[in-house]
Design a protein with these regions (language model features):
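Adenosine-phosphate binding glycine-rich loop
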Residues: 11, 15-18, 35, 214-215, ...
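Glycine-rich phosphate/diphosphate-binding loop of Rossmann-like nucleotide-binding domains
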Residues: 190, 195-295
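Glycine/serine-rich phosphate-binding loop and adjoining beta1-alpha1 elements at the start
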Residues: 89, 109-223
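Glycine-rich, N-terminal phosphate-binding loop and its surrounding beta-alpha-beta segment
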Residues: 54-126
Length: 427
């Protein structure tokens, strides 16, 4: 690690209480203690492999030049190239980016994908950008991180505030500099550029599978079980659609403006949101706040928006029997402890929302082979990998009297630690 990145890592490891990074580090510390790993393991696993902070200039449509901070954190490359999304969001910072890259590391190891973890992004509100400005910002950010990414090094993907269009621009920018087409440099691309069928819905599909299996393990028939979903975007919408198709009853969903109940069809509600930009005042619905949604008396609650949705202040009101974390880090440690004390089964983010990176892996494999799968093959293979991980976590939690979060973290951390030991320390 360079001197600069070591300083950044040190700065990133002094987070405020219950920040995403503090939460991630506390979970890692607990996993290391439970696994009886050494302080050498802690020192290795708690430190990002590489941190890049860049200035991203943007020429606005009116000719003004504005500067934005960009990041790319490669937390681990021990098990393979690092993998993780690119966020465009005004509130991202180094601490959050390191935390999310760390979670990606354990997520990839838990699902046994041959990847390490990464995360990146630009501190910008994408809603303030024109299409041309978004393209210029995406391409300039790509050019700034270009020396450290590649299909065998670090593979970005869409995240909050980015989509397949951004991935197309990133792939093209990298390919133009390489002198030939390199579709495998990113995943989540349009189908015609080497994307995979099933990638758009993959995270939501994985959440739906996690909900179904958690209900079965709790002895609850999924058919007719009730679900409330906070968030109705890339994860929440597709999860709601898949759950409805499985026969579950999605009784409430929300976006940043608040939530709604009483709708008849998830697809019709989504169409209304696309046409109006909000769920507010959707015909035939009743409104509720996001906090009220968290406290509904449903079988399953799915927080699928941003982090820190369930906190010490809101956790005691959670009445759901099961919480399935569709978002990254939606629960603070204090909120987690309260729900555990209240007997709520929490399916952690690194398991529940791993469908996205699993199908990203499929896309990467297809790009490397130039051989593409059917939608049915993608869904079957996603289910196989995720079901195996769910079974491993559930069995470990039961056998060792752990929470599912503890079991999932221990499995992921143990695999990365083992890989570190087997590779050794150079020189």
């Amino acid at each position: 690690m360079t001197k600069a990145s070591s300083q950044d890592a040190s700065r990133a490891k002094s987070p405020s209480l219950e920040s995403p990074l503090a939460t991630a580090l506390s979970q890692l510390r607990r996993a290391i203690d439970q696994l009886k790993l050494s302080e050498n393991d802690w020192n290795t696993l708690s430190t990002p492999r590489r941190i890049l902070e860049v200035a991203v200039p943007l020429r606005r449509d009116d000719g003004r030049v504005e500067m934005y901070k960009g990041y790319r954190v490669q937390y681990s490359t021990t098990r393979g190239p690092s993998k993780g999304g690119v966020r465009f969001h005004q509130d991202i910072d180094l601490d959050e980016t390191v935390a999310l890259a760390m979670l990606m590391t354990w997520k990839c190891a838990l699902t046994n994908l041959p990847y390490g973890g990464a995360k990146g992004g630009v501190a910008v509100n994408p809603k303030t950008l024109s299409l041309a400005e978004n393209e210029r910002l995406t391409r300039r950010y790509t050019s700034e991180i270009l020396p450290i990414i590649g299909p065998e090094r670090d593979i970005p993907a869409p995240d909050v505030g980015t989509d397949e269009r951004n991935m197309a621009w990133m792939m093209d920018t990298y390919s133009v500099n390489a002198g030939f087409s390199v579709p495998g440099v990113v995943t989540g691309k349009p189908i015609v550029l080497g994307g995979s069928l099933g990638r758009t819905s993959a995270t939501g599909d994985g959440v739906a599978i996690s909900v179904r299996e958690a209900l079965k393990l709790k002895g609850i028939d999924p058919k007719g079980a009730t679900v409330a979903i906070q968030g109705f975007g890339k994860v929440g919408y597709w999860a709601a659609l898949a759950l409805e198709e499985m026969g579950l009853k999605v009784v409430a969903v929300s976006d940043v403006s608040g939530g709604v109940t009483g709708f008849k069809s998830v697809a019709d509600l989504h169409k209304y949101m696309q046409e109006n930009g909000t769920l507010s005042n959707a015909p035939g619905t009743d409104s509720l706040t996001n906090t009220e949604l968290l406290h509904l008396g449903v079988d399953v609650l799915v927080p699928a928006a941003l982090s820190d949705a369930i906190t010490e202040a809101t956790a005691s009101g959670v009445k759901a029997k099961i919480v399935v974390e569709g978002a990254n880090a939606p629960t603070t440690p204090s909120g987690d402890a309260i729900m555990n004390d209240n007997g709520v089964l929490v399916v952690p983010d690194i398991l529940a929302n791993s469908g996205g990176v699993i199908v990203s892996y499929f896309e990467w494999v297809q790009d490397k082979q130039n051989y593409f799968w059917s939608a049915e093959e993608v869904k079957t293979n996603l289910s196989t990998i995720l079901m195996r991980a769910i079974t491993e976590v559930a069995d470990k939690a039961k056998d060792e009297k752990l929470t599912w979060r503890e079991a999932a973290n221990m499995i992921g951390v143990a695999r990365v630690a083992q890989a570190h030991r087997l590779r050794g320390l150079y020189p």
